[in-house]
Structure formats: structure tokens, C-alpha cells
Amino acid sequence: MTNSPRTAAIIVAAGRGLRAGAGGPKQYRSLAGRPVIARAMEPFCTHPGVMAVQPVTNPDDTEMFNAAVAGLNFRPAVGGGATRQASVRAGLEALAELKPDIVLIHDAARCFVTPELISRAITAAGATGAALPVVPVTDTIKQVDSSGAVDATPDRASLRIAQTPQAFRFDVILDAHRRAASGGRDDFTDDAAIAEWAGLTVSTFEGDANNMKMTTPEDFAREESRLMAALGDIRTGTGYDVHAFGEGDHVWLCGLKVPHTRGFLAHSDGDVGLHALVDAILGALADGDIGSHFPPTDPQWKGAASDKFLKYAIDRVTARGGRVANLEVTMICERPKIGPLRDAMRQRIAEITGVPVSRVAVKATTSEKLGFTGREEGIAATASATIRLPWGADGLAG
């Protein structure tokens, strides 16, 4: 069996990103609630084939960098140089003590890199020694002269757009960078160009059209909108219900018939757990409450099973193209004891709603003998619901 190559990654993050407009270096800007650099680094930090991640940053950005990537696992950042080329060389020299077989060099501004693309880069470098991801050119390209007049129309069939991570045998790209520096060449815009200059054959592999470089304000606006649309409109709601005890030998709790010394005084079956969940879901939808949909004055709901109400609330979410992400209910009572029933309650709620049981929580507490629940005069329940709706479900733009 062939051993996997020892692979390290360099994240180039020393640039100032002036074309992105005001707001500081683009790699530290928030994109849908998360810094660009954190999005760019995490796939490398968590990839099983990458043994070390070496950031290269501007020393003036240390505080921003540490805050942006907190929680990720990487080597201490090294300071970059005056050019991208100098910054990459600083990263290579920092990795020299590790002697990796393969190095991946990635721009921090490309924050949509995927684990699959990283794996392809490692494979390509292992096979050819030098490789970069590319995507086809789909637009017609015009070559112009200094006046802006069209000089030529290159055949786009032979053109490709270069991306990162670019992947190399570590020893050969380090040598190429050292030779370029000693020869006074500091004008290369990517590492594949340095490899070509050094006489290496650079192969290509399939890139990713989504692996774009965040460069302009328009890039940030477009990708912010796309990410927020994919995330969806997240809503939360809360609910509360209470029922007093009356005559009977059982109570309905979270969809279960539970033997008890008393029953509930209620128009329906009095299931406080499900009623609280219904109100939480309707609240997340801004769609009234259980009483407005199922009035206690309406005789058709006399003795009704509360699972009908909960299914109705779920259908209201589905009708708007949404889904329930999480349900939680807390029972407040002295008796009956909820602990032994917890898992069965979660399962029953999951069956009624279609929500995975892993996203259903049932908790219990007491009022420490205080109030009506402490005096065992009834049971109360609180609930919360988190739902996801598509942007525009209520007329709002994404």
C-alpha cells in the first residue's frame, strides 16, 4: 500500500485588498456572519490529508487574524512580504522544518474552497509534481492595445481561468521561489508562473466555478445575498400553556396517555405540551395562536386530540415552503414524573411532526413546591420552535 503524501497548506493572507473598497482587508470582512479568512482556512484545517496549515499574514493584522480564526487548528502565522510572491516564500521557509512532500498554496480571498477540491489538488501534485485547478473560459476574450482597440480574439478553447489551491512538490517549489528571489524576479502573480519560469511542467486539474476570489464590493454583495438565501429565513417562536387538574385517571402529555390520579379540565384533551408547541410554531410564523385557530367556544374541538392541532401547525409551515429545524418543550409539574417518559414523548412528537427525533427535546422541571404547580393543582409547559422559511415566503426580499 502506498503511503499518502505528507501535505501542508499555505494560506496567503497578507494583502490589503484595496479593490474590495472600504472596510479593512477583505480577508477579515464578514460574509454571511463569518470572516472570509475563516471560511477559507477551515477546509484545510479539517481535511484529513493536510497535516499542517501555515497562515501568512500582515503583522499589523495580528489582532484581527486571531479573532477571525479562533478555534481553528494551524501553525503560528508568519509575516508576509511586500508582494504575494514574497509572502508565499515566507510561508514555504516556515514549513521547511516539517519537510512536507506536497504543499498547497491558497489565497485567503478564495473562501469557497471545498474538501473535494483540496483532495484533487493533493492527488494532482502527487502525480505530476506541479498542478493548478482551472475552469473553462466561457466568455469571448479580447486582446486590446494600449489605446483600448481590439488587437486579437484568442481562441478560448485553449484558455483556462487559474484558481488556487495550487499544488506542488514542496522541494521543487521552494527551490523555484529561492531562485526567483536570488535572481531579482518578484513580479510573478501566482506560483504556477514561478514553476513555469523554473522549467517545471505544470499540469491542470478540474477546478470549481464556485471557488471564486472575493475582490470587489460587488463580489461581497452578490455572495452575501447567495449565502443568506441558502441559509434561509430563520424564525423562532415560544409557547406556553397550562391546565388545571379535574376528574379523571389519566392526562395527555406530549402525545402520550399517561396514567395519573386526576385528569385535566380542558375543552380538548388538554395536552399542555403539544399546545405549547403549537403556539411556538404559530408564533414563529407570526400566525396567531392556538386559540385563534381552534377556539375553545367551537364544539367541534370538544375532546379533540391535540396531535391534530400540532399537525395543523406543521402544515402551516410546509405550506409556506418551510421546515421545522428544532422543537423543545419543558414540562413544569411535581407529578407525574416526566423523566421515565422523556424518550417516548420525544418519539411521539417526532412521529406527529415528521421532525427527526434528534431535533426534538423534552425537558422537565418543578416550581420547588411554589405556586399552582407546586401545590399539584395543574401542569404548565413552555416550548420553543425554530423554523426555516425560504426568503420571500412573506414577501420579503432575500
UniProtKB/Swiss-Prot annotation:
It catalyses: 2-C-methyl-D-erythritol 4-phosphate + CTP + H(+) = 4-CDP-2-C-methyl-D-erythritol + diphosphate; 4-CDP-2-C-methyl-D-erythritol 2-phosphate = 2-C-methyl-D-erythritol 2,4-cyclic diphosphate + CMP. Pathway: Isoprenoid biosynthesis; isopentenyl diphosphate biosynthesis via DXP pathway; isopentenyl diphosphate from 1-deoxy-D-xylulose 5-phosphate: step 2/6; Isoprenoid biosynthesis; isopentenyl diphosphate biosynthesis via DXP pathway; isopentenyl diphosphate from 1-deoxy-D-xylulose 5-phosphate: step 4/6. Residues 235-398 are annotated as: 2-C-methyl-D-erythritol 2,4-cyclodiphosphate synthase. Its cofactor is a divalent metal cation. A divalent metal cation binds at D241, H243, H275. It comes from the Bacteria. Residues 1-234 are annotated as: 2-C-methyl-D-erythritol 4-phosphate cytidylyltransferase. Pfam families: IspD, YgbB. InterPro entries: IspD, IspD/F, IspD/TarI, ISPD_synthase_CS, MECDP_synthase, MECDP_synthase_CS, MECDP_synthase_sf, Nucleotide-diphossugar_trans. Its EC number is 2.7.7.60, 4.6.1.12. The keyword Lyase applies. This is Bifunctional enzyme IspD/IspF. It comes from Rhodopseudomonas palustris (strain ATCC BAA-98 / CGA009).
